[in-house]
Amino acid sequence: NLSVGGSLGNSHSLGEGRRFGYLLTAGYGIDTTRETGINRYRPTFDTDGSLVEYNRLRTELGQRSVDVNVLGTASVDLTADSSISLLALFNRSTEDNVEFQQGTLAEISTASITTRWQLQYLARTLFFTQLRGDHRNLGNTELRLRWTAFAGLGRRDEPDRRSVAYGQDNNRWLQRAGSGERFFSDLEQRDFGFDTNLQVPLWSTSAGEAQVTLGGTFRHSERTLLNRRFR
């Protein structure tokens, strides 16, 4: 297993009360696991009510997971009363799985050994970015405008999952559900939007102040799903 990461950031003065700053963080990790065990699923009951073993499979699972993530942000003062900031996030994780099962499947045959394999590759991706602005004292007045624009993408991609089973008649391929299948899946969601508000002061006295905020929000989201199965 391996995991590394790092960060880089700084800020600079641009003069006249303005500054620019940024921060970047990135990480990478890889993890490999192997699990073994015994699966005795779907037991039956004896006449006295005790559990009786129905299926018995020796199982082995190998998995390799990789994760990459990046986070960045930057902010700049355009003037003493106006600033813009940017945020971006990216994450991608993948899994490569191999599953092996061998033993007695009573629903197929109690007199022969059944062997099952499943290979699977799975990837998940997340991306998000946001741009924000804050503008004070517009036109030498006390008006304040704030706005935010954003976009995001989420995806789950399974480009290949295949399963096969052997048993009976000299370990021949079993023509049954879950054997000789290939499955593909792709789920994706996209979002983007914009939000803005204008702060308008009404009055300000020693006893208090009053203001009104006007604004609006727009958001669009769409999702697509594609599944295919071959046998």
Residue ranges and their predicted role:
Residues N1-E99, R124-T129:
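Transmembrane beta-barrel wall of Gram-negative outer-membrane proteins
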Residues D31-R40, S85-A106, T110-S112, R155-A165, ...:
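Outer-membrane beta-barrel and related beta-rich outer-membrane complex signature
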Residues F45-R56, S65, G103-R116, G167-E181:
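Flexible, solvent-exposed coil segments and beta strand-coil junctions
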Residues S75-T79, S83-L86, Q118-R231:
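Face-selective signature of the C-terminal outer-membrane beta-barrel domain
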